[in-house]
Amino acid sequence: MLTMRYVEKKVEQLPVARSLSIWWADRQSAAWRRRNPGKSFSDYYVDHVRRHLDRGKPHPTLGQVGFTHETGTGIDWDRANFAIRGRNAWREYRAAGVEPQMRIVDYGCGSLRVGQHAIRFADRGNYWGLDVAETFIEQGRRLVDPQLLEDKRPRLSAITERLIDLVAVWEPHFIFSHTVIQHVPEDELPLYFARLAKMMGPGCKAVIEFISAPRTKRIKAMSWAYSEARLRAAALSVDPSWSISIEDVADGTSQVMKKPRRVMILERD
């Protein structure tokens, strides 16, 4: 059965529609940044999504209202149906070698779609979820079983430079970043990797999922696909000591965008 979501997704794939949405997003972002001097495109993105969620509109990965599947109908998430979200994604990170006794950082935890499984998996106090927006985290808190939060005592924090320093002192063993870097514009990649570098001490591993393309491409108004070479260059410009590898993931496509995806693995000896 055709749904409005299905029609919207088909329209979004048209080159003219994509170009218009990018033009409109850039125009809106420029106006917002004039009203908010010193703010970045990512800050505009956060504000835009926050207002979207505040109006009760569905979002594919954030908040308490979503879609039954990529082109499905809207759904109100509750603790029961939310509990199965992100399970397959967490299996990918689980396969990367993370163990319950490790200190785990979820870099861009959003509304805990994947983070809830990391919380359940990790030993008490060994999960720290970070996101640029406190409002995204709070919506996740309301969807996760309160008993799980009480039992596992996860740390959940909005990102600031001071917070990144505190995470570095905590000395995480494993950092994952799921469907985050696709929303980071190219000129903000250095900040993304600089924060990651600061959090990573010796022996730490970071696993970053990204939408893959032969070259950098803006695939939606607020989403980018990156080439392996571009991400390597951006990371090594921040920290040349990183050991970097790129691997395929289990199903090979983004669950949200249906685009080719891979994972970037960064390690420190």
Question: Which residues make up each language-model segment?
Answer:
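A conserved beta-strand element that flanks and buttresses the S-adenosyl-L-methionine
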Residues: 176
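Active-site charged/polar residues at nucleotide-handling catalytic sites that mediate phosphoryl
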Residues: 170
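Conserved acidic residues
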Residues: 173
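Short catalytic micro-motifs in class I SAM-dependent methyltransferases
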Residues: 179-180
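Class I (Rossmann-like) S-adenosyl-L-methionine-dependent methyltransferase catalytic domain
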Residues: 2-96, 100, 107, 111-167, ...
